[in-house]
Amino acid sequence: MPSANPAPALHHERSVFDGWRSLVISLYMTLVGYGVLAGIPVISTAWATQLGFSDVQTGRVAGADLGGLALGAVLASLLVAQINRRLLVFLSALVAIAANALCMVLVDYEAVLWLRLLAGTGSGVYTAIAVANLGASSKPARAYNIMLFCFAFTQAGEMFALPRLSMDAIYGVFVAAYLFGLLFLRWVPPRPVEAGLDVEVELPDPELGTVVEHRHVPAAVPWLCLAAIAATYINIGAYWTYIELATARAALDKAWVSNVLVWVSFMSLLGCLVATVISNRFGLLRPLLVTLLAHATIVGMLAAGVTSMT
């Protein structure tokens, strides 16, 4: 029996960001830009074992890379409405390519630290444009769900393949990925359709069936969302950077840990599916709170001691 007061739904109008070319290149760019974040456990291990960095140095290099990712995203947010997006993508890709290529030549700690900050900044701008393009589609929730499914496969692939590569080969993979993406630069929409935070909501009407109502979104809402995302990624970044090194210090079998990380990445596919189903039924807030509490519990278990059980 239908509800007497059905919930309002967002009104979607197709735009240039809904074209398959825009969606495909945005998904690809997102996966490439998040490549270091996805593979940071094995990349951190490579910095420690192949370049001889200490745990503290490894953490700082990883922090520089991920900090650059955040810095680039902030920079992109300031420029994306004023500058052609294709130009931003081109320049940021060149920065990331140059920094990764130089990391093959300059291997001392100080040089790598600053080069990873530069590479992260380029990746941040590159990724932010892609994520903004996905969000500008008429159905952003669907676009982001597709991105998360693709991200899970990419992350699992990195967990499997990167430990088998040399440090230079890992950098080479990132360089090749950015170069390949530039071949499809024209698929990136150059300008947003419109600016503004307001939304249109479809509401039930007893006479007309459905009416579209314009609603204003307070400017504080996106900033609160950004703050929550930042806090979450700080937590994830700290955990994800050191998890493989921590298991090594706990004398756990390296091959077993590698397989666990691969399967953990695949399990995120199940998480995406569950999130899609329950968010359609219960909304976004309650499932998110449960997830954050679960994450906090797991981190607390690991803080008490890293073992094969935890």
What is each of the regions a protein language model found here?
Residues 52, 84, 105-110, 283, ...:
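Helix-breaking motifs and short loop linkers at transmembrane-helix boundaries and internal kinks
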Residues 87-101, 286-301:
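Structural signature of the two symmetry-related core transmembrane helices
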Residues 108-111, 137, 146-193:
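Helix-loop-helix hairpin linking two adjacent transmembrane segments in secondary transporters
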Residues 40-41, 220-262:
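Extracytoplasmic gate region of multi-pass secondary transporters
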Residues 99, 110-119, 309-310:
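Paired small-residue
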Residues 60-69, 258-268:
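Transmembrane alpha-helical segments of major facilitator superfamily
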